[in-house]
């Protein structure tokens, strides 16, 4: 038995030895992982430089406003097209070209106009009639009618034909409608293309479809934005309710941990039960209604998600999912009922620790603020990088041309290239560039994403070390709370920044590398979806699974390494090794106690999110009679509901993360305490009387007195 024990400890390190001078987090410590600290500083300097360069070259207006063939904005104040908000395509049929999907523009001249055409005219018929004054507004600015028809159409100065159109997302699209199953534009089923040929309206449909693909997503985004503008204050109220519920729950947990845990468990079961009942009620209500028996597969994807709520199969799917969750939770509670009692004792001890360090409940606000800064800087830099390209002009021609697709200058184009491409046009193609900066844009975007992951993980690591240091000072105080420092949270925060910035940078760097690899794998997966190579797909799934597991393991290891850093002040690698071996020597306790506690915290989050989500659902669907006239009219009521649910989860997660870090810290300290001490007068346990009673441990000195 002794040999087995010696072999086990040799494989997972040796237990901590008794140190009479150890009284908790070490104050006399030195800087750790200085190289990583310097590396982080240089990376931040580079990141700021990238942001400045992006902000210098970028123009976010390119995301909002359409541009004509010259790259000039339509409807933008302060430009010559300020009174021309709509983009008009000379030949919408050419938008059916695959070039639209590759370079996101139609290979046809485009100009900004005050209004979309409301009548059918050809250039040939309008040129020598009184309709030409109307027609001329759809020609290029400054057009002079001093050329022949063929030259005008060749040079792309006027469209060959205009047809009745309607604006959509500031673009003019043919006003196509169906009459008795026949597609028509205006009152015609065919149209003349301006060259003496009549074409079917379906050609216009194909062109409009390709040009409209991106615009459908934009229209959906605009409708969602409209919903936010009329419901944002109600969303804020819902998030405030979630915050108050989280605070109330934690305050009650401080005094009534055992009762609250069981109440929480029952409430989650009841909430899921109500969800099952509601789904069944909707499923029964739709029985016999026209169209309610259509399957989800037959319906396909619809941008208006409310359509799915009129299908019985949707509510059946919801009911099955909720029923599975209900059964799984009940089974887990049955098999883990004894372990729940142990977890409750840990939560009570954590409640006492949080009670003595109450300012720790406000620390998630610091983390949230710093994360918002990281997200804002990353998002703005990303937008400016993506819009920092310059207008690139390409030579286009309807006939073969040796310079076709070459870059050109619209100011000098007719002089230099007219001999080789007599029918060519220098047309705006896309926003890009041929400078070193423009060629490096993809790399800068990757660097931007990588720095976001690194800084975000650093902020989270700083919070974990700070909380761990504060709660460790509580555990290692022999007389709680008399032996605790005056300001444990601020002391831990100062130690983390002063001594361990390098270690935090090291741990967050490792995690950021794994996360950026996962992002690249997701990108490659999207590119390979159309491929038929099954081996490549299988390999991609395996890689994604492996890196997902690796990220979870690194997060777990980092979390415990940060606790050891907060206590002992050792570097990252030493702390990670010691934490890992300590957990491996107590793997059963880790699996049972720590994970059961995490499960209980998850139930608490579900209770808060479920309660606020149900309240938001009834409010935004006008089902609360008292305030049904107060709820705003919406395009998609699920927009504010999902926002409230996600926001409530993040708020609850922020508050429960403090408790979770407290439990993890106390648990690790508890394992150290068991290895360092034996309860004798010389080596007394630091754990509280509750934990000693729970584990049948006593301090002999206390027993003798």
Swiss-Prot record:
Interacts with COCH. The modification Phosphothreonine is found at residue 14. The gene is Slc44a2. One of its GO terms (biological process) is choline transport. InterPro entries: Choline_transptr-like (IPR007603). It is a multi-pass membrane protein. It catalyses: choline(out) + n H(+)(in) = choline(in) + n H(+)(out); ethanolamine(out) + n H(+)(in) = ethanolamine(in) + n H(+)(out). Exhibits choline transporter activity, as choline/H+ antiporter. Also acts as a low-affinity ethanolamine/H+ antiporter, regulating the supply of extracellular ethanolamine (Etn) for the CDP-Etn pathway, redistribute intracellular Etn and balance the CDP-Cho and CDP-Etn arms of the Kennedy pathway. Belongs to the CTL (choline transporter-like) family. It is found in: Cell membrane; Mitochondrion outer membrane. It comes from Rattus norvegicus (Rat). The keyword Cytoplasm does not apply. N-glycosylated. GO terms for cellular component: membrane; mitochondrial outer membrane; mitochondrion; plasma membrane. Residues 55-232, 278-315, 386-453, 525-562, 620-637 are extracellular. This is Choline transporter-like protein 2. One of its GO terms (molecular function) is ethanolamine transmembrane transporter activity. Glycans are attached at residues 187, 200, 416. It comes from the Eukaryota.
């Amino acid at each position: 038995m002794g040999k087995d024990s010696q072999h086990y400890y040799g494989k997972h390190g040796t237990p901590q030895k008794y140190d009479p001078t150890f009284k908790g987090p070490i104050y006399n410590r030195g800087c750790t992982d200085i190289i990583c600290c310097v590396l982080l500083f240089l990376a931040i300097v580079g990141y700021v430089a990238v942001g400045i360069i992006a902000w210098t070259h970028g123009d976010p207006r390119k995301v909002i406003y359409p541009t004509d063939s010259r790259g000039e904005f339509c409807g933008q104040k302060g430009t010559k097209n300020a009174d021309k908000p709509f983009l008009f395509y000379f030949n919408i049929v050419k938008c059916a070209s695959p070039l639209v999907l590759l370079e996101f523009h139609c290979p046809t001249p485009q100009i900004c106009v005050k209004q979309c055409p409301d009548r059918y005219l050809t250039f040939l018929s309008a040129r020598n009639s009184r309709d030409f004054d109307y027609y001329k507004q759809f020609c290029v600015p400054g057009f002079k009618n001093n050329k022949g028809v063929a030259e005008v159409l060749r040079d792309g100065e006027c469209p060959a034909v205009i047809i009745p159109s309607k604006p959509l997302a500031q673009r003019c699209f043919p006003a196509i409608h169906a009459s008795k199953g026949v597609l028509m534009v205006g009152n015609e089923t065919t149209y003349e293309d301006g060259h003496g040929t009549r074409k079917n309206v379906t050609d216009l449909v194909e062109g409009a479809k390709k040009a409209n693909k991106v615009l459908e997503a934009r229209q959906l985004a605009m409708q969602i934005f409209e919903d936010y503008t009329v419901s944002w204050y109600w969303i804020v109220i819902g998030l405030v309710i979630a915050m108050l519920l989280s605070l109330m729950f934690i305050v009650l947990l401080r005094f009534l941990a055992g009762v609250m845990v069981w109440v929480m468990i029952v409430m989650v079961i009841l909430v899921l039960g109500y969800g099952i009942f509601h789904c069944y009620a909707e499923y029964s209500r739709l029985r016999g209604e026209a169209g309610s028996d259509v399957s989800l597969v037959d319906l396909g994807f619809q941008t208006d998600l409310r359509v799915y709520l009129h299908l019985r199969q949707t509510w059946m799917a919801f009911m099955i999912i909720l029923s599975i969750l209900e059964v799984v939770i009940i089974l887990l509670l049955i098999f883990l009922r004894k372990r729940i009692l142990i977890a409750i004792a840990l939560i009570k001890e954590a409640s006492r620790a949080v009670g003595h360090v109450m300012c720790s409940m406000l620390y998630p606000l610091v983390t949230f603020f710093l994360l918002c800064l990281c997200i804002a800087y990353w998002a703005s830099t990303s937008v400016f990088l993506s819009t920092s390209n310059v207008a690139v002009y390409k030579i286009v021609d309807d006939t073969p041309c040796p310079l076709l697709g070459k870059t050109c200058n619209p100011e000098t184009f007719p002089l230099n290239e007219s001999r080789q491409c007599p029918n060519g046009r220098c047309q705006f193609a896309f926003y890009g560039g041929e400078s070193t900066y423009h060629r490096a844009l993809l790399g800068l975007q990757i660097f931007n994403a990588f720095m976001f992951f690194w800084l975000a993980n650093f902020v989270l690591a700083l919070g974990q070390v700070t909380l761990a240091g504060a709660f460790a000072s509580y555990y290692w105080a022999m007389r709680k709370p008399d032996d605790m420092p005056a300001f444990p949270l601020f002391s831990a925060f100062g130690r983390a920044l002063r001594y361990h910035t390098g270690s935090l940078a090291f741990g967050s760097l490792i995690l950021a590398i794994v996360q950026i690899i996962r992002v690249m794998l997701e990108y490659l997966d999207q590119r390979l979806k159309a491929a038929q190579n099954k081996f490549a797909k299988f390999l991609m799934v395996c890689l994604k699974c492996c890196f997902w597991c690796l990220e979870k393991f690194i997060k777990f290891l980092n979390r415990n390494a940060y606790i050891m850093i907060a206590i002992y002040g050792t570097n990252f690698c030493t702390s990670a090794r010691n934490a890992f071996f300590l957990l491996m020597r107590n793997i059963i306790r880790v699996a049972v106690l720590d994970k059961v506690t995490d499960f209980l915290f998850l139930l608490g989050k579900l209770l808060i999110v479920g309660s606020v989500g149900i309240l938001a659902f009834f409010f935004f669907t006008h089902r609360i009679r008292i305030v049904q006239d107060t709820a705003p009219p919406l395009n998609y009521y699920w927009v504010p509901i999902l926002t409230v649910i996600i926001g409530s989860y993040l708020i609850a997660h922020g508050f429960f993360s403090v408790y979770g870090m407290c439990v993890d810290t106390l648990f690790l300290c508890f394992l150290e305490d068991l290895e360092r001490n034996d309860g004798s007068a010389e080596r007394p346990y630091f754990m509280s009387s509750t934990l000693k009673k729970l584990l049948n441990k006593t301090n002999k000195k206390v027993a003798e007195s």
